[in-house]
């Protein structure tokens, strides 16, 4: 039985010239700005033009592009290996055809083996859904598994990506059974992976004082939450499970939210305000980006460059995103297997 796992993620500009069209695609999404056309179109044009220069400066600091695609490719490779790891049926090999830009082929697997191939589909920049569905259709799987790389479900991320895939899959005639994994905020391996990383950095931070652990999640407008979006509740549940797993007596911790844009009210407290509070209290900070599973501008620039300057030298311990952490890959593989 052939299975296609499609990793759904945000995407990011692959060059400075891609910054404005990337921003336009983001703000033109009806799940981001819920206005009818042509109003949404013209507003997306206006916002992307207005924000382009600042966004370009951000990406200039990290090599002129977003690293999210490269990071997601590594995750796809690791997941594909894990899903096919124990399948060895015959020493003969099967040819899978030419390598495609937006999927990672498995080389030489037994003719009678179950084959799973992992594809990458980005929402706002290449590889787009209309590109990836062609590769999936050519692969001709018996089953498609949609796996968003957003731990906590939100209509602005998870649902947007799923709807976009479904629209293109229907257009290109993908008719096989499709299963959807909507979140993994409470997955045991996901929780344990974070707990292990916190423990390591907490010990380092303890050398200069009693640390405060900040769980930093991408913020959302309160208007989205008030409509029933479960994102904030799932962030809180993720953190509660991690704190419980840590078994650290009298742990000082807080949830905070980053990357707010625009004048409307967003989830609070902000990561910046919590860092300022930690500075005033004179405590070292262990910061975990809880809603990100790969590095991009919000972690590499916002957390590592801008916010780091708030805290005294030697008092800031930023935990890396899970990326290809073995427990995280195990988490993703388990989600695929249990949904099969």
Swiss-Prot record:
Task of the protein: Catalyzes the ferrous insertion into protoporphyrin IX.
Positions annotated to bind Fe cation: 218, 298
Molecular function (Gene Ontology), one example: metal ion binding
Name this protein carries in UniProt: Ferrochelatase
Leader peptide range in chain numbering: none
One GO CC term, this protein: cytoplasm
Domain of life: Bacteria
Statement: the UniProt record of this protein carries the keyword Amino-acid biosynthesis: no
Pathway listed: Porphyrin-containing compound metabolism; protoheme biosynthesis; protoheme from protoporphyrin-IX: step 1/1
Family listed: Belongs to the ferrochelatase family.
HAMAP family tied to this protein: Ferrochelatase (MF_00323)
Any GO BP annotation: heme biosynthetic process
EC number: 4.98.1.1
Catalytic activity of the protein: heme b + 2 H(+) = protoporphyrin IX + Fe(2+)
Organism whose genome encodes this protein: Wolbachia sp. subsp. Brugia malayi (strain TRS)
Localisation: Cytoplasm
Keyword Transmembrane: no
